[in-house]
Amino acid sequence: MRINTVFATCSVILAIVSLGSRAVFAGETNVLTETKPPEPRFKISGWIDTGITFNPASPPDNQNFGRFFDDRANEPLLNQLVINFERALAPQPGEFDWGFKLQFMYGSDARYIHSLGLFSDTAATSIVQPDLVEGYFNLHFPIISEDGLDLKLGKFVTLEGVETIDPRANFFYSHTYIFNVGIPFNHTGALATFHATKWLDLYSGITRGVNTSIEDNNDSVSFHGGVGLNLLDGKLTILATTSIGPETPNNNHDQSYFNDIAITAKITDKFTSLTDLNYALNEVSDAQAFGIAQYFTYAINSWLTAGIRGEIFWDDDGFYVFSFANNHDPMRALEGEPTIDPRTVGGGKTTYGAITAGVNIKPPVPKPLAGLAIRPEIRYDCSLNDTRPFNNSSDRDQFTAGIDFIVTF
């Protein structure tokens, strides 16, 4: 009987061990099944952005004065068709890393963001043009600090400003005066980013100048750099940047200054404030401009966000704010050549005010439209000192309503 009892007990123990082993192996199988492979470092992506801006005044020159990327009144625009080839940096602690980015654009926005020497004279008479927006190598060195030093070599977009060339990073379809004329669009050269601490980044670079690349409009280099702060666990960020150097065609001595402070405050999970402070100075013309833009956005739900933006831009010397009526005139002005369209004009000595309100709609739709964003807006611009720069130089103010559609793929 004792032997039978022992055998029975052993049988129960073996059964329990067997079941436990199966459970363990089954658990391991589930873990292995659920483990996802790491995302590839090399990615191809892109987007399409198309929109229209309605101007009830229907100006004879077809221009929304002071506006670059939504400059055509009552005319649909293919703003951007963009494709990216990128290997982003993803450094491991103490290890060297490398990456690169090539971003190609075809669209009406390219007219204004060209750099001299890269597609700046290609399809110059067309409203839609090609451009190489960015083309650079990125190197990470695990030196000096815990997060090390990054070095960017090539052509890259500017550090400056709240708004960007990439429409997906902007709340509104239209841009501020600050973005259009108060900051550079791109640089070509070398830019170092030193991650001094978890909350402090230092930027320093040498470039060929503002919106230049293979060619330059003079023989001097420029400085581009600044300081970035990431505070309150990311709820407050401050980026103070500058670009300093000779930017006037055939002038290697007189300096141009583009200075900007961008402040982002996450007040609540749904409510965000952005502030853009700007100062520009051109020594050749002894001209300066000041700007301030304030944004507030509120996320109503997962797919709908409302926003408002107010701006004042002081162009008291009448040097900075222009409207380019010819598709190639922006590049002619950058090269120092005379513009050819009589309706490429400035607004005179004017202080501009603008207020914009709109929503961002990101409907929950299936692929291939899963990346759809719709940005309707209304905007009111005015001269605050009785000049008449708007609607074919006939009005003190200008009302527009715009909408664009972005599809990311």
Feature locations, PLM:
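Transmembrane beta-strands of outer-membrane beta-barrel proteins
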Residues: 42-50, 96-102, 149-153, 201-204, ...
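Outer-membrane beta-barrel pore domains
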Residues: 67-70, 110-113, 121-125, 236-246, ...
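Outer-membrane beta-barrel biogenesis signature
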Residues: 21-48, 53-70, 157-158, 162-165, ...
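Short loop/turn motifs that connect adjacent beta-strands in outer-membrane beta-barrel proteins
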Residues: 27-44, 89-98, 142-149, 199, ...
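Transmembrane beta-barrel domains of bacterial outer-membrane proteins
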Residues: 37, 54-56, 66-70, 78-89, ...
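Residues on the lipid-exposed face of transmembrane beta-strands in outer-membrane beta-barrel proteins
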Residues: 46, 81-87, 134-139, 153, ...
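Surface-exposed coil loops of outer-membrane beta-barrel proteins
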Residues: 57-73, 110-228, 237-246, 323, ...
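Cleavable N-terminal export/targeting peptides
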Residues: 1-30
